[in-house]
Structures are given as structure tokens and as C-alpha cells.
């Protein structure tokens, strides 16, 4: 492979509490464990994976802006911002970097307010309800799409 693709992983609010917060819904793996596994798999796939978790919407928006021209694909678990953030949607549309939306839980089987996403209709794909494995599936899909382009 002649090009080392760069993938940005973004995680939204409260995901820093994974492993402690409602493990029956979100699983027992910590975010650090999930990211370490992803970085290991990224190396095996020959891509670079960068990560940011933030509880602040503006930090996620700023990182998306910084990704323009620097990142080839975004994997994002916007967490609660899924249901509220026009700003993140507009940032993703503004940089025109393809992205996959990931959720650990099946948001469609939860409270009605979690059923709507401001990102799903503009994402390349959405993975939900598969726990931490969803991140791995998203990474694999992103790499396949980049190599097919």
C-alpha cells in the first residue's frame, strides 16, 4: 500500500466513564481498552488511528475542523450529542470527510429521545448495538472503503 491512511476516532460525552457507567448497557471495557485494541488493529491494517474523547461539543467540532486535509476517514461515537448537535453535523458536512457513526448500545431499543440522530442521514454507515465490537467493524469498513477508492 503506497498511502498510509489516517483515521480519526472521536468519542463524545461520558464515554470516558465506560467500564464504570451502566455496564449492563455499555459493557465492561473501558474506553482506554477499546482504543488500545483499535490502535493495535489499525497498525495491523496499515493505517494510522488518532483519538479524541471530549465531553465538550466545541472541542469535537474544533477537532473535526482540524481534520480537513489531514484525515481520510472519521469514526465517531457522538454519544448524547447524537440527539442534539447540529454543530457536529455541520462540522462533518463542512469538512466533507466520510464518517461512520458508532453506538455501543442499540439506541433504537432505548428511550424515544435516543431514536433520532442528527448524523445518521449523512453518515456512510451507522453501527449500533454491537458493543465495543462496533468500533472494530467501523475500522474495518473504513479501511475497506479507503482502499476501494
Swiss-Prot record:
Catalytic activity, EC: 4.2.1.10
Residues at the site labelled Transition state stabilizer: 21
Top-level lineage group: Bacteria
Catalytic activities: 3-dehydroquinate = 3-dehydroshikimate + H2O
Example of a GO biological process term: quinate catabolic process
Entry GO MF terms: 3-dehydroquinate dehydratase activity
Annotated active site: 26, 103
Biological or metabolic pathway of the protein: Metabolic intermediate biosynthesis; chorismate biosynthesis; chorismate from D-erythrose 4-phosphate and phosphoenolpyruvate: step 3/7
Keywords tagged on the record: Amino-acid biosynthesis, Aromatic amino acid biosynthesis, Lyase
Binding site for substrate: 77, 83, 90, 104-105, 114
PANTHER family: CATABOLIC 3-DEHYDROQUINASE
Subunit annotation: Homododecamer.
Similarity comment: Belongs to the type-II 3-dehydroquinase family.
Role according to the record: Catalyzes a trans-dehydration via an enolate intermediate.
This protein's name: 3-dehydroquinate dehydratase
Protein species of origin: Aeromonas salmonicida (strain A449)
Amino acid at each position: 500500500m503506497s498511502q498510509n491512511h489516517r483515521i480519526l476516532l472521536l468519542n463524545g460525552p461520558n464515554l470516558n466513564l465506560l467500564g464504570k457507567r451502566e455496564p449492563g448497557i455499555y459493557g465492561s471495557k473501558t474506553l482506554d481498552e477499546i482504543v488500545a485494541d483499535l490502535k493495535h488493529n489499525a497498525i495491523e491494517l496499515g493505517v494510522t488511528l488518532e483519538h479524541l474523547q471530549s465531553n465538550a461539543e466545541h472541542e469535537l467540532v474544533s477537532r473535526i475542523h482540524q481534520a480537513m486535509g489531514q484525515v481520510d476517514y472519521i469514526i465517531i461515537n457522538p454519544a448524547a450529542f447524537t440527539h442534539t448537535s447540529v454543530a457536529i453535523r455541520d462540522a462533518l458536512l463542512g469538512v466533507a470527510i466520510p464518517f461512520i457513526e458508532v453506538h455501543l448500545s442499540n439506541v433504537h431499543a432505548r428511550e424515544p429521545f435516543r431514536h433520532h440522530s442528527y448524523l445518521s442521514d449523512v453518515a456512510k454507515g451507522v453501527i449500533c448495538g454491537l458493543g465495543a465490537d462496533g468500533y472494530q467493524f467501523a475500522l474495518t469498513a473504513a479501511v475497506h472503503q479507503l482502499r476501494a477508492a
